[in-house]
Amino acid sequence: MNEEKAIKEFVNALKSKYRGRIKKIILFGSYARGDYTEESDIDILIVGDVDFDYVIDLCTKLLLKYGVVINAIVESEELFNKKINWSFHRNVLEEGRVLY
């Protein structure tokens, strides 16, 4: 399954480049719930000190390689903690799957 390969490569690339600077990587949305379709994108929240431009380049590379769209959100740990009680963040934490 290309989606699983893309997710694994995405997480491994981030862990390799930003070792010690990533606090969480969470898969959320339809792939986390298991109700995805072939039209679904892969939603991932990255918490930590990560360069958003690098993430966009990585998403583009994986789109070209696997034909899979990864929709990544990057937040600092401080911002994530400020928003932790917002409904979006509660949903991500409740239904999401922690990848790292």
UniProtKB/Swiss-Prot annotation:
Domain of life: Archaea
Alphabetical list of Gene3D superfamilies matching this protein: Beta Polymerase, domain 2 (3.30.460.10)
EC number(s) given by UniProt: 2.7.7.108
InterPro entries per the UniProt record, alphabetical: NT_sf (IPR043519), Polymerase_NTP_transf_dom (IPR002934), Type_VII_TA_antitoxin (IPR052548)
Cofactors, names only: Mg(2+)
Pfam families (alphabetical): NTP_transf_2
Span(s) of short sequence motif GSX(10)DXD motif: 29-43
GO molecular function: ATP binding; metal ion binding; nucleotidyltransferase activity
Enzyme class of the recorded protein, top EC level: transferase
Cofactor: binding details: Binds 2 Mg(2+) ions.
Keyword Metal-binding tagged: yes
Any coiled-coil regions, as ranges: none
Reaction it catalyzes: L-tyrosyl-[protein] + ATP = O-(5'-adenylyl)-L-tyrosyl-[protein] + diphosphate; O-(5'-adenylyl)-L-tyrosyl-[protein] + ATP = O-[5'-(adenylyl-(5'->3')-adenylyl)]-L-tyrosyl-[protein] + diphosphate
Entry keyword set: ATP-binding, Magnesium, Metal-binding, Nucleotide-binding, Nucleotidyltransferase, Toxin-antitoxin system, Transferase
Binding-site positions, Mg(2+) 2: 41, 43
Annotated positions binding Mg(2+) 1: 41, 43
Homology family: Belongs to the MntA antitoxin family.
Function according to Swiss-Prot or TrEMBL: Putative antitoxin component of a putative type VII toxin-antitoxin (TA) system. Its cognate toxin might be MJ0605, which it might AMPylate.
Official protein name in the record: Putative protein adenylyltransferase MJ0604
Organism expressing this protein natively: Methanocaldococcus jannaschii (strain ATCC 43067 / DSM 2661 / JAL-1 / JCM 10045 / NBRC 100440)
